[in-house]
Amino acid sequence: MNLNNEPIRAKRGTALTAKGWVQEAALRMLMNNLDEEVAEHPDQLVVYGGIGKAARNWPSYHSIVSSLTTLDNDETLLIQSGKPVAVFKTHEDAPRVLLANSNLVPAWANWETFHELDKKGLTMYGQMTAGSWIYIGSQGIVQGTYETFAECARQHFGGSLKGTITVTAGLGGMGGAQPLAVTMANGVAICVDVDRSRIDKRMETNYLDIVAHTLTEAIEEAELAKKEGIPLSIGLVGNAAEVLPEMLDRGFVPDIVTDQTSAHDPLNGYLPKGFTNEQGQVLRREDPQAYISLAKKSMAEQVEAMLELKKRGAIVFDYGNNIRQVAFDEGIRDAFSFPGFVPAYIRPQFCEGKGPFRWVALSGDPADIDKTDEVILQEFADNEPLCQWIRMARRHISFQGLPARICWLGYGERARFGKRINEMVASGELSAPIVIGRDHLDAGSVASPNRETEAMKDGSDAVADWPILNALVNTAAGASWVSVHHGGGVGMGYSLHAGMVVVADGTAEAARRLERVLTTDPGLGVVRHADAGYQKAIETAKATGIVIPALAREGKENG
């Protein structure tokens, strides 16, 4: 257990605990992942996404903390599935930490094998940003969720969700962004979760507006708000596998239907219908196989209801939790007849190297984030959608843990922003260094055929070289810490992905690292999509001077 049994909270201010700011940044971000304001179950080291953890167990956590505190500026700490396994002498431009989480040999890459190894204390589920120490609470996915719903509005509802009702489920660390994202797009949302504490947490952080005690009340509130054209988010305690069929029985068809339950993990992330949380915990402990079987059956029934709502006119899409795959495996042959959110709404942004870029103020002072917001508004004043996002984020988003900001910046923009931030740290305009990172859900850092790389133009959905190349090139470029994970978002066997973090500490060395890393990282996203044949990515590469040998050869041959 935690040695002093006190809540974990990252240190604030400019006094160092570690030997350098990069090590200090890793230490603070590890602790921030487990802050009670941030993590879903910090007492279990669980950050978000079912059982996505920051460290394998408490001894490993304390060993990591100790290692980061004593790590020299030319050493690298190796983390194997949440456990520190070695410190090697490297060099000052090398990452201070390299992490590999949840990786299994492909033929063994399934939940059954993972759970066996997990019970033996040999592995840990890192999700995406849980095990890579760059989770910032629900804000981390808010803009991506907003961009998804905004694009859905552009394609189907004339550019706004005003006068529409979205029904979704799952209000955990990721799904909790949905109600705020929908209301930011001027829509109405009914958000279902089996766990009242999750609903309460979203209320506390102003992501949810109200709580309905019955489905009848939720529908009445939603229809009234829709009629009046006002944005409103409604939390409803319930099981989506029961609520969606009941909506069908009542003849209630929402405008949009999706789902962000933790369906990627049938044992720990989804409650079978007919069970209370307490009953589910007992069955999970006493007969996990029976629990998994019932959970999968319930998922299939939920997907059947989603398919029927689609037939009745709702816009339905998968939000990347692999629920369609489970339903398909359970015999629902048309489970994939509604699309995933990436091919439906997000991929064009990936072609420009855009994705969920984020930064965190190690000072703990919200004023530092206010100043970085101003940088975005000044440096990118010609990008009105981006500036509009920053203005909305300032108005609506509450910080969880260390103050942070998320916004989707693309190739060229990230390096430009990083340079400016480093200058502000150097001048003292910002009171302490800034951590810059991103979600693993990014343009060139993930292979996930049921999510980020679904329906690739050239059929390369399952090609997993790209996240490996991403981790390698970011390591070579001098990222502060780099991670390679398996199974995030969609579960064991369905994804490989990489993360990176780079620290702006105001030094000339940091400036060079920032320039390299914030170029190679989004650059590979452009390359990955250009290689798959996306014209927008090819044009972006040509316009920005990214060297792609195949394109260069084509140019010479055509010239």
Curated annotation (Swiss-Prot):
E.C. code: 4.2.1.49
Functional pathway: Amino-acid degradation; L-histidine degradation into L-glutamate; N-formimidoyl-L-glutamate from L-histidine: step 2/3
Cytoplasm as UniProt keyword: yes
| Chain positions recorded as NAD(+) binding sites | 49-50, 127, 173-175, 193, 198, 239-240, 260-264, 270-271, 319, 489
GO terms, molecular function: urocanate hydratase activity
List, separated by semicolons, the cofactors it needs.
NAD(+)
- SUPFAM superfamilies, from UniProt? Urocanase
Which residues carry out catalysis? 407
Q: From what superkingdom does this record's organism come? A: Bacteria
A biological process (GO) annotation for this entry? L-histidine catabolic process to glutamate and formamide
Tell me, in one coarse class, where this protein mainly resides: cytoplasm
Its UniProt entry gives the catalysed reaction(s) as: 4-imidazolone-5-propanoate = trans-urocanate + H2O
Q: Which UniProt keywords apply?
A: Cytoplasm, Histidine metabolism, Lyase, NAD
* Annotated family: Belongs to the urocanase family.
Q: Tell me what this protein is called.
A: Urocanate hydratase
Can you name the source organism? Shouchella clausii (strain KSM-K16)
Task: List the top taxonomic levels of the source.
Answer: Bacteria, Bacillati, Bacillota, Bacilli, Bacillales
